[in-house]
């Protein structure tokens, strides 16, 4: 990934992000904002405005311009969303956040239906994994109704409170921006989620069955291309 950004890693001769665009379009999401940083031009030059993929794409660069050069500068996943919203309110309805380097076949329509049925402001999609694998992931702890209570980041197997893991797929309502400060680094997992739990906001885990391959993990990538 020194020369190729993760969303551009090829699977069956297509960048992984192209599969995500197809999934989004299939479920009626055609307005897409891509938060770019590392090798941003590789992504923008390939996908452009999204027209040939049946969607509309806009880009937000996570960093600054110095002497005409784009300098990547992480402001966190939530910080990136907030900057987009502060610049021009893009998120005016229920929206979905995906990682650009995961291959999934999630039923997004059903996920959004369940999110709304819960009356959630924020939902995260969880997936059950074999108990001996929990130490590779962030574990989600909920009450019987699915309301998120806490997280364990890569716990030891015997200390894990559950076998439900955070897949990095989120559904939000625009009200979530009330919990994200402007102009400072802020991460969805490390900062926003604990804040939502502390505030008692309607924040739920939605367990779903689907294929999920993390292209950022080398064994998962080999599994995908086979």
For the regions a protein language model found, what residue spans apply to each?
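Conserved N-terminal catalytic core of the sugar/cofactor nucleotidyltransferase
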Residues: 2, 9-99, 108-110, 142
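Short, well-ordered turn and helix-capping elements at secondary-structure junctions
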Residues: 47, 63-64, 126-128, 152-156
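Conserved beta-strand termini and adjacent loop/short-helix elements that scaffold enzyme active sites
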Residues: 60-62, 125, 206-208
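Catalytic-core segments of class I nucleotidyltransferases/pyrophosphorylases
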Residues: 92-96, 103, 109-116, 129-134, ...
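A short, conserved acidic/glycine-rich loop-to-beta-strand motif
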Residues: 118-128
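Extracellular disulfide-bonded cysteine-rich modules/repeats
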Residues: 138-140
């Amino acid at each position: 990934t020194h020369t190729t950004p993760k969303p551009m890693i090829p699977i069956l001769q297509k960048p992984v992000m192209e599969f995500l665009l197809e999934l989004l379009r299939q479920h009626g999401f055609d307005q897409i904002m891509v938060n770019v940083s590392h090798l941003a031009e590789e992504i923008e030059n390939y996908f452009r405005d999204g027209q040939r993929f049946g969607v509309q794409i806009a880009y937000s660069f996570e960093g600054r311009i110095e002497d005409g050069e784009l300098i990547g500068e992480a402001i966190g996943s939530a910080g990136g969303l907030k900057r987009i919203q502060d610049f021009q309110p893009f998120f005016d309805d229920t929206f979905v956040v995906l990682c650009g380097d995961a291959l999934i076949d999630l039923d997004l329509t059903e996920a959004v239906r369940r999110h709304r049925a819960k009356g959630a402001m924020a939902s995260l999609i969880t997936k059950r994994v074999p108990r001996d694998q929990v130490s590779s992931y962030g574990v989600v702890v909920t009450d019987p109704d699915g309301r998120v209570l806490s997280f364990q980041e890569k716990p030891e197997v015997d200390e894990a409170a559950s076998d439900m893991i955070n897949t990095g797929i989120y559904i939000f309502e625009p009200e979530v921006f009330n919990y994200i400060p402007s102009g400072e680094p802020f991460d969805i997992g490390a900062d926003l989620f604990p804040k939502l739990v502390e505030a008692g906001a309607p924040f739920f885990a939605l367990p779903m069955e689907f294929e999920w391959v993390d292209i950022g993990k080398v064994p998962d990538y080999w599994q995908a291309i086979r």
